[in-house]
Curated annotation (Swiss-Prot):
Chain's role: Component of the Mediator complex, a coactivator involved in the regulated transcription of nearly all RNA polymerase II-dependent genes. Mediator functions as a bridge to convey information from gene-specific regulatory proteins to the basal RNA polymerase II transcription machinery. Mediator is recruited to promoters by direct interactions with regulatory proteins and serves as a scaffold for the assembly of a functional preinitiation complex with RNA polymerase II and the general transcription factors.
Keywords: Activator, Nucleus, Transcription, Transcription regulation
Oligomer status and interactors: Component of the Mediator complex.
Superkingdom, natural source: Eukaryota
UniProt name for this protein: Mediator of RNA polymerase II transcription subunit 20
Gene: SRB2
Main location: nucleus
Length: 218
């Protein structure tokens, strides 16, 4: 599969209803509700303080300031992504100076519990973004078969924006398909700026890196 992501902050929480009505007008098949969850983990300040200073009396504020710019094993942040349509699978994405080539892997969604329970002395959950929306499918000679997902994005219950995801079957997206997608986006009045096409990895890993690029630090 190939995915394209788009995030817009210049909307309200009710904008999604307008776009869903437009999808219905385009005769898209409603596949039901869709949701996702993106979590960001950062190095535990206490762990960095112990490993670098061998001193348990470092003030908490200094530890947190150090953690903001520090890495553990060359990794500065871990992200986990779960999506409603890929139940049981979680994408694990890393960022940092040591991350080269494949930036992540697909793991069981139980890995999130391992991070929070077994590895909390090393990694701390810093941010959770949740998306709630719907999934549609477009079919036609112009588009091929493409799924359109859209969701309101929330950070700790506060609305932050609207995310679109376009998913194509196959391993590549040719120029013709990309052109038809842009025509569909423009004719539907959907946001067309800041489209994230491609990315590191492939399949779900590529999707995970797109989510991180679009939503990290939002």
């Amino acid at each position: 599969m190939v995915t394209i992501l788009q995030y817009s902050a210049d909307v309200t929480a009710t904008t999604i209803s307008t776009y869903r009505s437009e999808l219905s007008a385009q005769l898209a098949q409603n596949l039901g509700k869709w949701s996702f969850e993106l979590k960001m983990y950062k190095p535990n300040p206490a762990s960095i303080g112990r490993s670098e200073h061998h001193n348990g009396n470092i003030p908490q504020g200094q530890q947190e300031a150090a953690a903001a710019d520090q890495e553990i094993g060359g990794v500065a942040a871990l992200y986990t992504l779960t999506q409603a349509h890929s139940k049981g699978d979680m994408v694990y994405v890393t960022q940092g100076s040591a991350v080269q080539g494949q930036p992540g892997v697909v793991v069981s969604d139980s890995f999130d519990m391992v991070l929070q329970n077994k590895m909390k002395s090393i990694w701390i959950l810093r941010q959770t973004l949740r998306g709630d929306g719907a999934e549609y499918e477009l079919m036609g000679d112009a588009y091929g078969r493409v799924k359109v997902r859209l969701a309101n994005v929330f950070l700790q219950g506060t609305f932050r924006g609207l995310l679109f995801q376009y998913e194509y079957e196959g391993d590549t997206l040719d120029d013709r398909q990309q052109q038809h997608l842009m025509e569909f986006i423009q004719s539907s009045g959907f946001p067309s700026s800041n489209l994230i096409i491609g990315g590191n990895g492939s399949g779900l890993v590529q999707t995970g890196t797109q989510f991180v690029e679009a939503l990290a630090q939002k």
